[in-house]
Amino acid sequence: MARWEVVVRRWLLRSSLLLVTVTAALAATTLPAMACGEEQTHGPHTAAARSTGAPGAEKNVKAVGNVPDAQGAIALQFLQYGNRDVMVVSGEFGLKTYDLTANPAAPKLIGKLDMPGMWETEDTEVDPLRKRVFLSRDPRAFGGNVRTGESGVYIVDLAKPEKPTVLSYVKVPAGHTTSCINDCQYLWTGGPAKADSQPAEWGGRPIWVTDIRDPRKPKVFPQPIELARNDGKTDYVHDVQIDAAGVAWASGRGGVRGYWTEGMHKDPVTGKVRPASPTDPVPYAGGGINETAAPSKFMHNSFRPVGSMAPDGGSAGHWGNGNLIYATEESFLDGCAGDGVLVIASLEGSYGGEGWRSTPQKPYRLKTIGTWGVAGQEGSDPASADCSAHYFDVRDNVLVQSFYAQGTRFLDVSDPTNPKQIAYYRPADAAAWAPYWHRGFAYVADNNRGIDILQLTA
C-alpha cells in the first residue's frame, strides 16, 4: 500500500463491520453509524496493524497464559473426557482442540480441522454428552457475501478430540450463529442480514430449525420461526441462549424474547395451553429493550439468572428470582460514547405476550434497571473508537465481558442496578470477542491475540 493511502479501521476487528480501505482524499469523510447486522456488516476481517492511543492497561488481573497459534479465534467451549479437560476453539481457521488437563494455563494443541476462510462460528456450541461441535457457516464464509453466499451448519464429531471429523454439512437459509435446542437434538440457526432471495420486507434472517437426531442426515424445516420480532417486523435474530429453566432466549434486532421448546405451557398470545416443540415453541416472556438504554435496538446475546444460575446474576431484590435479563447491545457509532453497552432489564410485565403484540404505533419495552459501557471508564483507551460490548459470562456475581479493542472487563453485578468495574485487561493489540469462566480462569477468545488466560488478583 502506498504511503499516501490510509486504512480506515473504524470497524476493524469487530464482529459487525467490514474493513474499509479508502484513499487519503476520502479519509475525512464521515462514515455512517451502523449496528451489527446492517446490509453488509459483521463480515470477515483483513489483518492490519492496530493504531492505538494509550498503551495497554490492566488492573486486579494478571495474564497467566496466551495461545498465539489460535489467532483468529472467535469462540471457545470445553469438553470433559473422564478426567481429561479439552478446550475447543473455533474461528477463521476452522476448529482446534487443546488439552488443559496437565496445566490449564498452558493449553496443548492436540487436534485441528482446517477450514481457512471460515466465518463466523460465533458462540459455537457443543454437545457435551455425544461430543459433537456445531459450526455455523455465515454466507460470508470462504469469500461469499450476505446477498448471495451459501450458509449452513457443519456437524463435527469429537469422540476423539485429536481427530475432529465432519459427520455432515447441511445448507440452511441462515448461518450466523447456531444453538443447541432440547439437549442438542435440534439446532436453531439465525442471522445475518437477509439474502437477495428472501422477502424484501425482512430486516434480517429469523431462525430455521434443524433436526439433528440423526447427525449424518440433518433435516432442515422449511418454515422459519421467531418472526415479526421487531415491533411486528421479521428481523435479524443474532443468537440464542438457553437458561437453567430450559427457556430459549432469542436476541437480535428488536430485543430479547424467550420460548419454551418442550412440555405443555400456556401460550400468552392465544391464552391456550399447548405443547411446545423446537419447531413450534410457546412464547414465554421478553420484548424490546428501551431505546434510551440501547438506541440501536440490536441485542446480541443474553443471560437470565434463574434456577441453578440464579446466584450468579446478583440480587434479584424486589424484582424476584428469574425476572432479570442481562443482554448485550452491539452497536458502533462514530466515537466511543454511543457504542453498545451491557443492559440489565426486568421481565416484569412481559409474561402476557406483550413482546409479541408490540407495534411501531404501540411499542412494548422492558424496563431497564442497569447499564454499563466502557466509554470513559478507567482502563479505556480514549483514542480508540472500537468500544462496543460483546459476549459475556457470569459466575458468582462477577460478569466478565469482551469489548473488542477495549479489552476484557470484570464487573461486580451483585447489585444489578449498579454494575461496577473491579478489574480490566486491555492489551494494546486487543480484539477481545468472548470470555469464558473455566477452572477459576477467564479464557478470552481474542481475534488478534489468540487466547488470553486471565486470573483475578483481587
Predicted features and spans:
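N-terminal secretory signal peptides that target proteins for export/translocation
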Residues: 1-11
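Feature marking well-ordered beta-strand scaffolds used for ligand recognition
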Residues: 4, 15-458
